[in-house]
From Swiss-Prot:
Disulfide bonds listed in the record: none
GO biological process, one term: bleb assembly
Transmembrane annotation, as ranges: 1-21, 67-87, 95-115, 137-157
Glycan attachment points: 35, 43, 128
Top-rank taxon: Eukaryota
Signal sequence, start to end: none
Stored InterPro entries: EMP_1, PMP-22/EMP/MP20-like, PMP22/EMP/MP20/Claudin, PMP22_EMP_MP20
Protein name, UniProt field: Epithelial membrane protein 1
Annotated membrane topology: Multi-pass membrane protein
Gene encoding the protein: Emp1
């Protein structure tokens, strides 16, 4: 049981770090024809990044930014609550609070990346038809899966 909790803790930390990276880095869409990429915050072309996104004033990208930041916050809160529950909770109880907080993180990731997918991932306004999703977009979907698994495992596990 201790090994399972330690492994869950390590995966939770890795998920939080991956959420930081996927939110901060500017590689959500990559152009095949040039050294160019677009993120949530900046547009990078030829190694020069500027804060001017072609869709920067749209409400959808602001919603994606907000939900990704909320997912990071809820992931960190869940991690702190888990550590707190690990040392203060009585034996036999479940990690409901940390699990439910992680599932809120999962929901924030789902909403944020779904909005991005609907509005920007397949649009030709970013580059052209020869662009593809970058590693941040893929990393966010991986974090989506990990946060769901972590949240469910927190809800199921009991402290021994």
């Amino acid at each position: 049981m201790l090994v399972l909790l330690a492994g869950l803790f390590v995966v939770h930390i890795a998920t939080a770090i991956m959420l930081f990276v996927s939110t901060i880095a500017n590689v959500w869409m990559v152009a095949d024809y040039a050294n160019a990429s677009v993120g949530l915050w900046k547009n990078c072309t030829g190694g020069n990044c500027d804060g001017s996104l072609s869709y920067g004033n749209e409400d959808a990208i602001k919603a994606v930014q907000a939900f990704m930041i909320l997912s990071i916050i809820f992931s960190i809160i869940s991690l702190v609550v888990f550590v707190f529950q690990l040392f203060t909770m009585e034996k036999g109880n479940r990690f409901f609070l940390s699990g439910s907080t992680m599932l809120v993180c999962w929901l924030c990731i789902l909403v944020g990346v779904s909005i991005y997918t609907h509005h920007y991932a397949h649009s030709e306004g970013n580059f052209n038809s020869s662009s593809h999703q970058g590693y941040c977009f893929i990393l966010t979907w991986i974090c989506f899966c990990f946060s769901f698994i972590i949240g469910i495992l927190y809800m199921v596990l009991r402290k021994k």
